[in-house]
Amino acid sequence: MYTKKFTSMEKSMEEDKRIVKPSSSLIVVIPTILVIIVLWLRNITILDYTHVLLGGTWTGIDLFMGLVISRVMIKMSVGARIEFIRRLVPMMLFFMPTIASLAITAGIYLATYEGIFSLRYPVIILAGIIVLVLVIQGFAIFLPNELRIYFELRKSQPDSKKISRLALINFRLSGVQAAFQFAIIFIMANIANGNLFLKF
């Protein structure tokens, strides 16, 4: 009986030590399936709602990471900081790139369905430039840093300073991305008002 309990505790501890669990795939699969269903329905209202929801989630998380988490992280002890980063890895490695990609995809389809996905509109050009900057930041800096953190955490003796440095870079980058997303929100507001040429 005690052996079974001990084995169960061992398994539980091993599960807890895992950085990425099988359930982590759900934060990629579920949003992706939902967006595919929304695109298949071709309902502009539902697609608009989905785009706003995804974009708002992306902006909110980036803002929280950049303004709050980065400041809290500096005041943490090294051990607490590394454990906190380890817990965040699944979200930062899988959820954030997924939400960002789906928000952009939903936005492109929405603009196409509304007949405004054209380079003759300044709002589309500006939105495209900002999205390009966000994509470059996300997939050329943010994601590679998260992968470095993940592989460093898997080592028998992780480099705490390296992990903290990379995590802080990403948290601060999240704040920068939030600023670009505010610009996107301004553009979206103009599109909603029919001001496609940004006339004031």
Label every PLM stretch briefly.
Residues Y2-F200:
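Polytopic transmembrane helical bundles with strong interfacial aromatic enrichment
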